[in-house]
Amino acid sequence: MHEAQIRVAIAGAGGRMGRQLIQAAMAMEGVQLGAALEREGSSLLGSDAGELAGAGKSGVIVQSSLEAVKDDFDVFIDFTRPEGTLTHLAFCRQHGKGMVIGTTGFDDAGKQAIREASQEIAIVFAANFSVGVNVMLKLLEKAAKVMGDYSDIEIIEAHHRHKVDAPSGTALAMGEAIAGALDKNLKDCAVYSREGYTGERVPGTIGFATVRAGDIVGEHTAMFADIGERVEITHKASSRMTFANGALRSALWLKTKKNGLFDMRDVLGLDVL
């Protein structure tokens, strides 16, 4: 067994992403699976987390109480729902635990709670933990600065039928990257739906389109369209393991941080490019 540099706890251990995170934690050099959590009353409580994830016996039992495992982890990884994540955030803030947050769908109050907690603990909060997606966000900033003022900009995203929020957190991050590069606020220029007689496209807006179907892991395209040409920048994920590995990489990166709010671009050093 490799020597652990960081011990992690995984929220939502029985979910699609939770199982991928457990597999990644058990396989990644420098990481130790310290705890796995499920909601109270879950039929999965008492299971071996590794066996649950199809990764072999881990010796870590799935539990519902953070209090019971507070001494077993350094960083808490959460890809669940906003209400649950905020409960976990309060606990980690109280006990000085770092967090990696991949949950999407937070309202403004939830985002503010994360910002406030980051004054005391270190948090990596990102809409997407894929290396490729975060490289794409950097490319979008550069494309927007060159083409954004004279292009019609549309963002199209597709996910599996079980995803509960729309647009996806990644699509919103794409919009924010583009809007920021154009010195705009996404709230002021986003168009999230079109139906019926809409009139002509309003110049300077950023449109969003959402697809929910089948088992699509995640596809995102940003379109910069002008008369006679268009540029499309696309990312397609074929496995959730890319997100899981990015989250574990973030947990390792957090080991030297006392407090602060970071995203994957900080982890990858993309802001220096």
UniProtKB/Swiss-Prot annotation:
A family per Pfam: DapB_N
EC number: 1.17.1.8
Record: active site: H159 (proton donor/acceptor), K163 (proton donor)
Pathway membership, UniProt: Amino-acid biosynthesis; L-lysine biosynthesis via DAP pathway; (S)-tetrahydrodipicolinate from L-aspartate: step 4/4
Subcellular location: Cytoplasm
Residues binding NADP(+): R39
Keywords assigned by UniProt, alphabetized: Amino-acid biosynthesis, Cytoplasm, Diaminopimelate biosynthesis, Lysine biosynthesis, NAD, NADP, Oxidoreductase
Family to which this protein belongs: Belongs to the DapB family.
Function according to Swiss-Prot or TrEMBL: Catalyzes the conversion of 4-hydroxy-tetrahydrodipicolinate (HTPA) to tetrahydrodipicolinate.
Protein name: 4-hydroxy-tetrahydrodipicolinate reductase
Upper classification of the organism: Bacteria, Pseudomonadati, Pseudomonadota, Gammaproteobacteria, Enterobacterales
